[in-house]
Amino acid sequence: MLRLWRYLCLLLTVWFLCNFGPVYVVRAQNRTGATTHPDEALALNSIFAAWRIRAPREWNISGELCSGAAIDASVLDSNPAYNPLIKCDCSFENSTICRITNIKVYAMEVVGSIPQQLWTLEYLTNLNLGQNVLTGSLPPALGNLTRMRWMTFGINALSGPIPKEIGLLTDLRLLSISSNNFSGSIPDEIGRCTKLQQIYIDSSGLSGGLPVSFANLVELEQAWIADMELTGQIPDFIGDWTKLTTLRILGTGLSGPIPASFSNLTSLTELRLGDISNGNSSLEFIKDMKSLSILVLRNNNLTGTIPSNIGEYSSLRQLDLSFNKLHGTIPASLFNLRQLTHLFLGNNTLNGSLPTQKGQSLSNVDVSYNDLSGSLPSWVSLPNLNLNLVANNFTLEGLDNRVLSGLNCLQKNFPCNRGKGIYSDFSINCGGPEIRSVTEAVFEREDEDLGPASFVVSAGQRWAASSVGLFAGSSNNIYISTSQSQFVNTLDSELFQSARLSASSLRYYGLGLENGGYTVTLQFAEIQILGSTSNTWRGLGRRRFDIYVQGRLVEKDFDVRRTAGDSTVRAVQREYKANVSQNHLEIHLFWAGKGTCCIPIQGAYGPLISAVGATPDFTPTVGNRPPSKGKSMTGTIVGVIVGVGLLSIISGVVIFIIRKRRKRYTDDEEILSMDVKPYTFTYSELKSATQDFDPSNKLGEGGFGPVYKGKLNDGREVAVKLLSVGSRQGKGQFVAEIVAISAVQHRNLVKLYGCCYEGEHRLLVYEYLPNGSLDQALFGEKTLHLDWSTRYEICLGVARGLVYLHEEARLRIVHRDVKASNILLDSKLVPKVSDFGLAKLYDDKKTHISTRVAGTIGYLAPEYAMRGHLTEKTDVYAFGVVALELVSGRPNSDENLEDEKRYLLEWAWNLHEKGREVELIDHQLTEFNMEEGKRMIGIALLCTQTSHALRPPMSRVVAMLSGDVEVSDVTSKPGYLTDWRFDDTTASSISGFPLRNTQASESFTSFVAPRSEISPRNNDARPMLGAQMNEGR
């Protein structure tokens, strides 16, 4: 009996420690009786009450502010799981009193002024109030915080002058006042803060000159001085900041020349110096900066030549010397720098030819608008290369038309149709598909994947576009922005739901225009930065750029949102007069360093435009159509008569053959009858590209058949999907996939290069995406690291692709098999939805389609799995599952986990009910955005609701992910599959609803079930596609 009692006592002790251990330990940390100083406790409670935020239980245990995480040295300020957060020092008055030393209220959408009580917390050493909507001014009482070391007010709406009392904070190491609305000059007193290591005053609103007292800031390691209205020359004393590793001076109004003292800054790894007026400088000052990895010296009136020793800068990854006055030849050693990936030399007067060799890492090259000549080296045809060679004098004879297509029209003086105008207008939907406006004007599509150094020429050589620039600090450069907003002052909202972005310079050209006067119409809508009335820090951004028409500056520091009355739902139209005298028209949008850099994301700046057009101010005399290949009307008539006769004879023969083989080639006929026919490859071409389908080139095996990597004669790497011989289902999918994907073109949909239907051979040829599929990245060997921001962008990209399929494409399409293995990643980790073999064209006038069930277990919506009830909400459900997989880094089902975690959707719901959603986030992520994580989980649960009517359309999903609208509350349990058990060969009994699968995502089991209702007692549905490992890579 005594032994039993001891056993029960032991169990009770273990239970007590498991449940109350953490609290007990925290209280043990305060055994001395140390408590928060009552004045500070009152002040902090007043501050939080004014800001309508609460002190969380992690550091406010039983009402004691300085407890838990607040006194736990292992909890760092940078930990996103703790926000808001305070830290305390409890060593005062014989360890009986705690003083508040740190306050973090970061990106919490706090609105209002800073309460006066904050300035009474004199023991503060670290204050982080960044990314809120704080208003009002900073008072002189700021000088009370003399112990302050790190002070951040960046990205708020603070105004008024900076008080001179800031000079009393002599222990300050970091000062961030960037992206605010301050006024007045930069206080001289900041120069007293001689221990400063980091200073960020970009976009702060301050003006005047850089104070002479800044010469004392010799401990500086990082300095951002950009987007300001400063006066005077760049001061010499910056050359004394010899500990600098990062320096940004962009769009400040400071004039040159660049001081020779800059040559002392040999510790720099990143130098961004741009938009300096007056004064000519050479590149002599960089001669000893051999540690640089990023060197941007854009638009600075630089003269002279590129240093011959540039090949010694072995750490250089990005070099931008564009928009200067450099001359001479390009050193061959520059193109062979091993680390260099981005090179911008455009808009200089460089001559000679391109180097004959190029380093493997160099994938983005801009040499546009120079005096380069000669033949192009062989490397220009390499795949995965962004190359802008516009406006030079290259010899292009013998160049394959598929390589740098249209470049002949964009050489110096724009020679195509020069002297014989054939067009009298053009209209372009920038960044979007072809659109017909309410006035019946056709805006041609311009949704090419223009990268950091790119150009495109339209099929009829009517217009062209050229873009250069790399967004600073952005891990995933995006050059098209999309939105589902409806705009209140136009009947053509669709025209403004996409926009072309550029990080530096964006040009549109009208080619072959009849000479005369034109009205140029530019249309804009700010769809990336929210309105400033949105009560979120994401609405505090400012975009500004310059506009030139025919070389004439027509807008300086143009701000789309401000012009629209600070509205993001109003479109803006601008009209300018231009004269065309040499058959071409140029519209140039140029970023001159102005605007905020990082709101709502890193790299949200530079030109943005929705549509471009030009119409004549005269009566045209040209046909406004591409030139006819015929030489004379007589020849045309004779040709037609002869052609009709021959066609009649041939038609009879063809009809006879077709009728004879109709049953055999029904899929060929479907392809031939398509409006937009895919490019047709010969079987021998694809055999050669894949080295006769060599097993070493095999990427995977799917239900459709094997997939091979290949290389075409033009150098393009492709993925070739080969239809399994004799597969009737495969032939149906072959046609379905061609019909579906040929009807759509989008940045987030895999690109079909063409197909082969020669004899019994059926092959599809896709762009090759080197980073494989999302499931491999998430659940594979983890050779590809996806950080949080990348996962979020992948989620947003997939959502945008589905919006296009459901709502924007000419043919509405339900994919039916959205899953992690059907989302491929390109070299920049941009997601592409692939594998349209199960896609259904969808009539949006119908409420749903009844069809046989096809898809992958684990991603199937309940109404579709149970009743074959198909709508676009079927894809929404599958997207929700993929979103959860992205958040958690695990498949939707895993038999190796404990029961409560085995099924991802069920586990997510249980955590949501307990308010512990954050536990779902992948523990392998060292950093993540808490707000985005909760948002993504909430959206995923909305997308997987049992009733399809409760699931949001994908356009609303994009708006919620983008932060344009709030995430709706999840009010009911999602429709996860609870009792429907499947295996690789049969879908067995259904004993209830909702449903849950038992197969892990990594098995990628797809199945096809009969169209009719599936019987719960006698279900003979069988997986007919089999395992789709690495499908479509």
Swiss-Prot record:
Record's subcellular location: Membrane
GO CC aspect terms: plasma membrane
Glycan-modified residues: 30, 60, 94, 144, 181, 264, 280, 301, 347, 351, 393, 579
Modified residues (Phosphoserine): 821, 850
Phosphotyrosine modified-residue sites: 766, 864
Residues that coordinate or bind ATP: 699-707, 721
Spans within the Cytoplasmic topological domain: 658-1033
InterPro entries named among the record's database cross-references: Kinase-like_dom_sf, Leu-rich_rpt, LRR_dom_sf, LRR_Rcpt-Like_S/T_Kinase, Malectin_dom, Prot_kinase_dom, Ser-Thr/Tyr_kinase_cat_dom, Ser/Thr_kinase_AS
Extracellular side: 29-636
Membrane topology note: Single-pass type I membrane protein
Lineage: superkingdom: Eukaryota
Major localization listed first in the record, in broad terms: membrane
Reaction equations catalysed: L-seryl-[protein] + ATP = O-phospho-L-seryl-[protein] + ADP + H(+); L-threonyl-[protein] + ATP = O-phospho-L-threonyl-[protein] + ADP + H(+)
Listed transmembrane segments: 637-657
Domain Protein kinase: 693-951
Signal peptide range: 1-28
Active site (UniProt): 817 (proton acceptor)
LRR repeats: 97-121, 122-145, 147-169, 170-193, 195-217, 241-264, 265-288, 289-313, 314-337, 339-361, 363-382, 383-406, 422-445
Main enzyme class: transferase
EC number(s) given by UniProt: 2.7.11.1
Annotated stretches, region: Disordered: 1012-1033
Keywords: ATP-binding, Glycoprotein, Kinase, Leucine-rich repeat, Membrane, Nucleotide-binding, Phosphoprotein, Receptor, Repeat, Serine/threonine-protein kinase, Signal, Transferase, Transmembrane, Transmembrane helix
Family annotation (PANTHER family): LEUCINE-RICH REPEAT-CONTAINING PROTEIN DDB_G0281931-RELATED, PROTEIN KINASE DOMAIN-CONTAINING PROTEIN
Family listed: Belongs to the protein kinase superfamily. Ser/Thr protein kinase family.
Protein name as catalogued: Probable LRR receptor-like serine/threonine-protein kinase At1g56140
